[in-house]
């Protein structure tokens, strides 16, 4: 079947069930096809019929509608139609229709058909002229109609805003600007970058072969940064080479990104100890929220001015024979994330119950009504205004029940999903990994997904890839390795959303050990109250974790590995598990006994005693998932009692 993208495709306007539809005229289709969303009297056939379409493929059809009324230019036509989901069209006029109402004549801008005689509606039999519509015209009309709808909706929204919504809009306008050093930026703090050895000169020779494109882009970009006061010409003895990168994100933006190699400077300077918040701790904070807003600090780092003594350290070289230094905190310094996170944490101090920042991304979250959420958002905006923090208006997303944040999509029903761009990056890697660096990047991307809890038993699948990263092992890549990478990528294409538990949900963890790997999953038992039925409990998957036992741990007995798997899983989710009782499910009756009976503190069992003491801090109710009737459970319980 031809697609709507074919500029020569023929469409005519028809009316079915009083709804006007752009129907595709397909001389290669055996019979008329309709999308299931068109409400016809569908009848399931005893056996499917096979139809051929224009691309020569054959498909099975199970539902058919007889005597479908199709109105064209106020003339009634009738034809049998079958239901097909994958046609890509609302309605396709096939050969059964064209043969029934022949002669069928097709011109450049029209088609002609013979309308049938219908005495019931006084319709004569006659040839009718039907103008055709091309896909480009359909698209033009659709865009125009959509634009009109959007403009009307914006007009209605603007005139129907509540006083609170208007206040939020006006305050957002006041704190937004495209220039991070606008007069709105009233921050007077000056950032210091200090050398470990103040006498050291950090000067990296620039031996990069620049292209003519590089020279032109550096000239334009640096001139713009000088004009904005972001950089200035320098006579510093320090220098780092600048270059352009064009990775996946840059290709999507259609703009290359300037990068400065501050590797030598980072080795020579004192770091910053302020830590970035962990993603899991962020998710713990926002659990149970049903309204979200995100704000973005405009060119975040650039809102912090450098101390005059620190500016020369940031000097960089680029063509054509230029030497600049930064007036603001540049990207690429090892101290930059910690410095900026500290800046944001101080500015938003006291708002932690409904607001958090991850570097330059701000998330406002509430479990409340929309109005209450907007009230909290207004507090955050007014704080930004007070502190002179400039935001990006085009990146502000206000009062949503589903929102993207840090590579995740947060939903008000408690589910979280990976954003598509994260999986796109993984898909870009070839199956046949070329070298160690590419393998490191692949595993790093995979770890990002695994750390969010989306991958089940991923350690078992990647355990043979990690040794290849080590330079002590000769590089070798086999067809089996390529097959494994392909399998992992396929697995990542179909990741189920995870549930983020509410405070009132009861938590369950399930653990297992197998050979040299361990795995666990976290579930939440959610109590539902469906209308007209009894209350029911539904277990929802929250996240997975897994790992590889160390070489020493791999020598442990099966029972010890099962116990250690439970401990490692509880350590991983300690923050979620410690506050209240939860259930630990295991298929090891040994672990059940381990949790119930105290060990004797003797030198033969020192490791197990330490594990049991650690176990005691968790309010776990251990459940043997194979049931109490398992004879091994009784045997092992007696074994524990004798110790």
Curated annotation (Swiss-Prot):
One of its GO terms (biological process) is proteolysis. Residues 226-410 form the Reverse transcriptase domain. Pfam families: Peptidase_A3, RT_RNaseH, RVT_1. One of its GO terms (molecular function) is endonuclease activity. Residues 6-209 form the Peptidase A3A domain. It catalyses: DNA(n) + a 2'-deoxyribonucleoside 5'-triphosphate = DNA(n+1) + diphosphate. The active site is at 26 (for protease activity). PROSITE patterns: RT_POL. Its EC number is 3.4.23.-, 2.7.7.49. Keywords: Aspartyl protease, Endonuclease, Hydrolase, Magnesium, Metal-binding, Multifunctional enzyme, Nuclease, Nucleotidyltransferase, Protease, RNA-binding, RNA-directed DNA polymerase, Transferase. InterPro entries: DNA/RNA_pol_sf, Pept_A3A, Peptidase_aspartic_dom_sf, Rev_trsase/Diguanyl_cyclase, RNaseH_sf, RT_dom, RT_RNaseH, Viral_Replic_Matur_Polypro. The polymerase/reverse transcriptase (RT) and ribonuclease H (RH) domains are structured in five subdomains: finger, palm, thumb, connection and RNase H. Within the palm subdomain, the 'primer grip' region is thought to be involved in the positioning of the primer terminus for accommodating the incoming nucleotide. The RH domain stabilizes the association of RT with primer-template. Belongs to the caulimoviridae enzymatic polyprotein family. Encodes for at least two polypeptides: protease (PR) and reverse transcriptase (RT). The protease processes the polyprotein in cis. Reverse transcriptase is multifunctional enzyme that converts the viral RNA genome into dsDNA in viral cytoplasmic capsids. This enzyme displays a DNA polymerase activity that can copy either DNA or RNA templates, and a ribonuclease H (RNase H) activity that cleaves the RNA strand of RNA-DNA heteroduplexes in a partially processive 3'- to 5'-endonucleasic mode. This is Enzymatic polyprotein. It comes from Cestrum yellow leaf curling virus.
């Amino acid at each position: 079947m031809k697609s709507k993208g074919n500029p020569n495709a023929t469409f005519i306007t028809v009316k079915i069930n009083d709804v006007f539809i752009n129907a595709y005229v397909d001389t290669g289709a055996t019979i008329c096809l309709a999308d299931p969303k068109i409400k016809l009297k569908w009848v399931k056939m005893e056996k499917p019929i096979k139809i051929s379409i224009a691309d020569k493929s054959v498909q099975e059809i199970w539902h058919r509608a007889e005597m479908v009324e199709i109105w064209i230019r106020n003339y009634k036509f009738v034809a049998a139609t079958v239901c097909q989901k994958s046609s890509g069209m609302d309605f396709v006029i096939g050969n059964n229709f064209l043969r029934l109402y022949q002669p069928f004549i097709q011109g450049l801008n029209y088609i002609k058909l013979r309308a049938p005689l219908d005495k019931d509606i006084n319709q004569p039999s006659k040839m009718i002229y039907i103008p055709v519509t091309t896909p480009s015209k359909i698209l033009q009309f659709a865009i125009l109609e959509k634009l009109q709808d959007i403009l009307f909706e914006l007009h209605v929204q603007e005139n129907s805003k509540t006083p609170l919504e208007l206040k939020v809009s006006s305050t957002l306008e006041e704190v937004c600007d495209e220039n991070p050093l606008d007069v709105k930026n009233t921050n007077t703090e000056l950032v210091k970058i200090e050398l470990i050895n103040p006498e050291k000169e950090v000067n990296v020779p620039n031996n990069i072969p620049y292209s003519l494109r590089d020279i032109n882009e550096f000239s334009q970009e640096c001139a713009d940064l000088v004009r904005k006061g972001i950089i200035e010409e320098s006579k510093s003895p320090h220098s780092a080479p600048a270059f352009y990168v064009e990775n996946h994100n840059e290709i999507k933006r259609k703009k290359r990104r300037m990068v400065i190699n501050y590797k030598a400077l980072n080795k020579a300077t004192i770091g910053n100890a302020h830590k970035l918040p962990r993603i899991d701790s962020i998710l713990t904070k926002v659990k149970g929220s049903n309204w979200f807003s995100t704000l973005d600090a405009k060119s975040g780092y650039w809102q912090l001015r450098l101390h005059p003594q620190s500016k020369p350290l940031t000097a960089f070289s680029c063509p054509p024979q230029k030497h600049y230094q930064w007036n603001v905190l540049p990207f690429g310094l090892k101290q930059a994330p910690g410095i900026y996170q500290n800046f944001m944490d101080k500015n938003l101090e006291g708002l932690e119950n409904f607001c958090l920042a991850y570097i330059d991304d701000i998330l406002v979250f509430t479990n409340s009504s929309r109005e209450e959420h907007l009230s909290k958002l207004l507090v955050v905006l007014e704080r930004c205004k007070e502190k002179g923090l400039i935001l990006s208006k085009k990146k502000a997303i206000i009062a949503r029940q589903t929102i993207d944040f840090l590579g995740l999509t947060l939903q008000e029903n408690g589910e979280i999903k990976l954003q598509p761009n994260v999986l796109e990056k993984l898909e870009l890697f070839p199956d046949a990994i070329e070298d160690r660096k590419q393998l490191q990047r692949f595993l790093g991307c995979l770890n990002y997904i695994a750390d969010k809890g989306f991958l089940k038993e991923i350690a078992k699948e990647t355990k043979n890839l990690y040794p290849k990263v080590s330079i002590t092992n000769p590089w070798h890549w086999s067809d089996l390795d390529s097959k494994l990478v392909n399998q992992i990528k396929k697995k990542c294409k179909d990741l189920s959303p995870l549930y983020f538990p509410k405070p009132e949900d009861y938590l369950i963890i399930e653990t297992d050990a197998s050979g040299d790997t361990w795995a666990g999953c976290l579930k939440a038992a959610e109590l539902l109250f469906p209308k007209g039925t009894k209350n029911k409990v539904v277990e929802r998957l929250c996240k997975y974790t897994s790992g590889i036992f160390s070489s020493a741990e791999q020598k442990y007995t099966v029972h010890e590995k099962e116990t250690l798997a439970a401990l490692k899983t509880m350590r991983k989710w300690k923050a979620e598990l410690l506050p209240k009782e939860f259930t630990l499910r295991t298929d090891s009756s040994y672990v059940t006994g381990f949790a119930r009976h105290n060990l004797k503190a003797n030198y033969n069992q020192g490791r197990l005693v330490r594990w049991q003491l650690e176990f005691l801090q968790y309010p776990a109710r251990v459940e043997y998932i194979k049931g109490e009737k398992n004879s091994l459970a009784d045997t092992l319980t007696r074994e524990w009692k004798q110790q």
